[in-house]
Amino acid sequence: MRTIQVTTPGVQYPVYLGSGLLPQVASRLRKLTAPNSRIFIVTSPEIWALWGKKLLSGFGKSSPEVLFLPAGEAHKRMASVEKLATALSESGADRSSLLIAFGGGILGDLTGFLAAIYMRGIDYVQIPTTLLAQVDSSVGGKTGANLSTGKNLIGSFHHPRAVFADVDVLHTLPPRELRAGLQECVKAGIIRDAALFSYMERNAETILAADDAALTRVIAAAVRMKADVVQQDEREGGLRMILNYGHTLGHAIETVTHYRGLLHGEAVGWGMLAATELSRMRGLLTAAQSERMQRVILAYGPLPRFRAKAEALLEATARDKKNRAGTRRFVLAEKIGHATIVEDVTEAELRAVIAWLLQRVREAGQLREVGA
């Protein structure tokens, strides 16, 4: 087992990474909670059917209460938060209670937000069950819910007490889910870890085969990168924005397709292709550098096609959380392993890269079309 510490000015917590962690969760939680504290697990029926017994095996007779939330982006909304909060209240949860977010990134984000606001804040831990959640959303304290007008427009910073990333759960992931999570790992390499990027470039076949050693190496590198960034910029005042590489257009794609058909990592994959091309258009990358990045992004595809109008994507980017005072901020690459935040992207440049992206989508004879 590897342990990676996430340290900020106000909090420190461990990310445990390895095989066979689920039965160990209960014993480690005893060190984090007061005697007789209530523990509540928030999970989906699907995850519980696969891994619930394994997680409960360490609790003995003092089994936590389980609250179910259906999987899917459509349930990442305030109505779900209210429903879960009501269930906690009816069950007698108090300020000493602890929540366990046992699922993918959507469930983890929502459970973290619930923990942040229930009784003005209670503790929680993350047990991410997708690769994307293990390397990204479970680390760093961002929590939230979606509005109809955009993704994660309601939320707070609320760090977990611990993260348990058990690689065993990844073996039940559909291959498409695994590939979507690997897009976030490619992102980590592009923005801040050239060695990780090169490793993923050389070992795509082994990584895509879900080799334990290869996956653990990639996950550990991505988590360390994010922990380092969060330590330097907890509240996204500057450096932490680089973690949004590919997310400006990625979130726009999710918004205009109504969160249907594309997984988050797939939308980010398309967004990274666009960000890489915009970096080339601006002269930050050479054509060779841009092509190399795009080859590795596509090596962890295929990316599903989607249908969207350029104007709809343009409008969605205007609501991006990175924007300030009407200025569109973009995270662009300067070289492999280094990203920068650009604040002067013009509408003309954005229209040009959206046109380029939609042409690439039309040319992609992969999977199926989604969206409307």
Swiss-Prot record:
Residues binding Zn(2+): E184, H247, H264
UniProt record, GO biological process: amino acid biosynthetic process; aromatic amino acid family biosynthetic process; chorismate biosynthetic process
Disulphide linkage map: none
Gene3D superfamilies per UniProt: 3.40.50.1970, Dehydroquinate synthase-like - alpha domain
Pathway participation: Metabolic intermediate biosynthesis; chorismate biosynthesis; chorismate from D-erythrose 4-phosphate and phosphoenolpyruvate: step 2/7
Reactions mediated catalytically: 7-phospho-2-dehydro-3-deoxy-D-arabino-heptonate = 3-dehydroquinate + phosphate
EC number: 4.2.3.4
Keyword Transport: no
NCBIfam families recorded: aroB
Amino acids binding NAD(+): T129, T130, K142, K151
Gene it is expressed from: aroB
Alphabetical list of Pfam families matching this protein: DHQ_synthase, DHQS_C
Cofactor: how bound: Binds 1 divalent metal cation per subunit. Can use either Co(2+) or Zn(2+).
Essential cofactor(s): Co(2+); Zn(2+); NAD(+)
Protein name per the record: 3-dehydroquinate synthase
InterPro entries the UniProt entry points to: Dehydroquinate_synthase, DHQ_synth_AroB, DHQ_synth_fam, DHQS/DOIS_N, DHQS_C
Subcellular location, record wording: Cytoplasm
Summary of the function given for this chain in its UniProt record: Catalyzes the conversion of 3-deoxy-D-arabino-heptulosonate 7-phosphate (DAHP) to dehydroquinate (DHQ).
Example GO molecular function: nucleotide binding
Family: Belongs to the sugar phosphate cyclases superfamily. Dehydroquinate synthase family.
Main subcellular location of this protein, as a coarse class: cytoplasm
One GO term describing the cellular component: cytoplasm
Species name: Acidobacterium capsulatum (strain ATCC 51196 / DSM 11244 / BCRC 80197 / JCM 7670 / NBRC 15755 / NCIMB 13165 / 161)
Keywords (A to Z) from UniProt: Amino-acid biosynthesis, Aromatic amino acid biosynthesis, Cobalt, Cytoplasm, Lyase, Metal-binding, NAD, Nucleotide-binding, Zinc
